């Protein structure tokens, strides 16, 4: 799951403060900051295309539509919309040609290019992707300027160590890992696609190598892989590199091109969203251990070495290994209490069967709109990291928001076989959920006595119906791995007493207390 603290460390943020009041004391008179603000304000002139100007020139993609960003990530093309070596090379090429046109010699062009890159790093707030690409470009320029004859791979390794010294937590930045690893393999095995082959084949090979290298990073961070991304890149790489990017830079200078750029952006987004609507190429893969990651990189390194020699048969072994990883399960028998903040969610797994009790859900306060299901950041990544694609039983202890609201999200993102409700009348939330279940043809039941799953029984302890939803909670008793579990939902003291009077369960090993322990 997403580790906010580790993310902040990777961005060189080591503490968080709350500002109670703010007062403008004076303007920053620094020349560089003034120029930076002027350049950013220039981008605001392009009203329609500003999000992409901001993303592809200044490295800030916070203005991009979240659904579009999700489609880019799902299609495996998000790297094209973060500043990378391609963007730096185009910018540097434009600047280099400009210096040549006004009569600067080779040596002066190199020095001014270094200053340009240093200022560009400052302009983009020293973002991780810009730092990596710019430091590498500066290393290549210095290598050429002083004729050091250092290989590009060694320049990249030197760049890596510089970034580690500046911020060791860069290793936790996914973009940095993508950038360094893919660049390393593309440079090290550049003979694979530097031969006399067609542009389409060269683009495919670059995408193929990039996909294989990025596979473990994708799996261990997103737990899903789109196997069509190699082919999607055949369209998006040339389109973004040779059409969209040049228009972004040109429109920044010539504002009247904004309408054309906006049309290209819409085309790009529509195609990405259309492709993202197809789910068949997306495979959920459970998290890879360090052992499997090491073995994987050894295998693909051997494969690339053989491809350099023109031998392609080893690719079949790589594909078989990836297929094995995709169907490998990391689902031990057990009970996991998932942290969903204010709410409940419990995962029970045995004999490859999956039972999810409650889904959590964010409580709404006042007019605050409910937008982001907590299950998206907690339950979904956790289940996917275990390779879970299907939930055999989704048990709703009762219809309170903090137990059942994200059930809508769960049934939208997982194959759910059956849903179990508690006794008593359905509340409004449960009625809405039932409408969704009917549309998806998902079976649902209520007020059941027990579930028998592969000779493991979950007993639903019934003591009659109550006047409040909390005491009508499904109370579940089960034995797993030699331990006795009791899940109380939001049941209060009255129902606890009734259960103890009716059932002999005083020797429970693990008790999930009712109503989060507050009643």
PLM regions and their residue ranges:
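Active-site environment of divalent metal-dependent phosphoester hydrolases
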Residues: 88, 127-131, 363-364, 399-404, ...
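Aromatic-rich juxtamembrane segments at the membrane interface
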Residues: 10-136, 141, 393, 458, ...
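Active-site HxH/HxHxD metal-binding segment of metal-dependent hydrolases
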Residues: 401-438
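Membrane-interface amphipathic/re-entrant loop segments adjacent to transmembrane helices
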Residues: 24, 29, 74, 219-235, ...
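Membrane-interface helix/helix-cap signal primarily in integral membrane proteins
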Residues: 1-79, 366-369, 374-384, 390, ...
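Hydrophobic alpha-helical transmembrane segments in multi-pass membrane proteins
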Residues: 17, 68-230, 287-330, 423
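Divalent metal-coordination and catalytic microenvironments
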Residues: 56, 84, 125, 175, ...
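Core dinuclear metal-dependent hydrolase active-site scaffold
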Residues: 162-172, 276-393, 438-510, 515-518
């Amino acid at each position: 799951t997403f580790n906010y603290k580790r993310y902040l460390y990777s961005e060189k943020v080591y503490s968080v403060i709350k500002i109670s009041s703010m007062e403008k004391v004076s303007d920053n008179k620094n020349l560089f900051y003034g120029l930076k603000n002027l350049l950013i304000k220039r981008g605001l002139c392009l009203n329609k295309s500003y999000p992409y100007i901001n993303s592809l020139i200044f490295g800030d993609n916070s203005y991009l539509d979240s659904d579009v960003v999700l489609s880019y990530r799902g299609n495996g093309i998000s790297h094209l919309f973060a500043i990378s070596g391609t963007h730096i090379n185009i910018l540097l090429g434009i600047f280099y040609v400009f210096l040549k046109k006004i009569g600067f010699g080779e040596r002066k062009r190199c020095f001014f290019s270094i200053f340009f890159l240093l200022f560009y790093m400052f302009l983009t707030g020293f973002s991780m992707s810009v730092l990596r690409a710019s430091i590498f470009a500066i290393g290549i320029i210095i290598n050429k300027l002083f004729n050091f004859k250092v290989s590009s791979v060694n320049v990249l390794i030197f760049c890596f160590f510089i970034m580690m010294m500046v911020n060791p937590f860069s290793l936790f930045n996914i973009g940095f890992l993508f950038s360094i690893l893919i660049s390393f393999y593309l440079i090290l095995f550049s003979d694979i696609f530097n031969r006399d082959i067609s542009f389409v084949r060269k683009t495919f090979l670059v995408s193929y190598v990039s996909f294989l290298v990025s596979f473990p990073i994708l799996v261990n961070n997103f737990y899903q892989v789109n196997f069509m991304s190699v082919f999607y890149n055949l369209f998006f790489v040339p389109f973004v590199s040779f059409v969209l990017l040049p228009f972004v830079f040109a429109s920044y200078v010539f504002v009247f091109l904004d309408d054309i750029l906006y049309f290209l952006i819409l085309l790009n987004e529509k195609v990405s969203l259309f492709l993202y609507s197809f789910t068949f190429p997306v495979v959920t893969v459970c998290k890879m251990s360090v052992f499997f990651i090491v073995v994987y990189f050894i295998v693909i390194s051997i494969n690339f070495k053989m491809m350099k020699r023109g031998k392609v048969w080893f690719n079949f072994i790589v594909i078989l290994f990836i297929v094995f990883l995709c169907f490998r399960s990391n689902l031990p028998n057990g009970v996991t209490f998932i942290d969903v903040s204010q709410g409940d969610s419990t995962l029970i797994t045995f004999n490859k069967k999956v039972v999810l009790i409650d889904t959590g859900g964010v409580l709404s306060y006042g007019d605050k709109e409910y937008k982001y299901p907590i299950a998206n950041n907690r339950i979904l990544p956790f289940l996917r990291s275990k390779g879970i694609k299907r939930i055999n039983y989704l048990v709703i202890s009762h219809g309170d928001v903090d137990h059942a609201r994200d059930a809508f999200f769960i049934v939208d993102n997982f194959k759910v076989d059956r849903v179990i409700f508690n006794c008593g009348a359905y509340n409004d939330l449960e009625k809405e959920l039932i409408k969704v279940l009917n549309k998806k043809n998902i079976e649902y039941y209520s007020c059941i006595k027990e579930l028998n799953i592969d000779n493991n029984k979950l007993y639903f302890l019934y003591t009659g119906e109550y006047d409040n939803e909390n005491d009508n909670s499904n109370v579940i008793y089960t034995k797993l791995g030699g331990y006795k579990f009791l899940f109380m939902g939001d049941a209060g003291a009255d129902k606890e007493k009734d259960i103890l009077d009716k059932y002999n369960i005083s020797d429970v090993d693990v008790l999930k207390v009712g109503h989060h322990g507050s009643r």
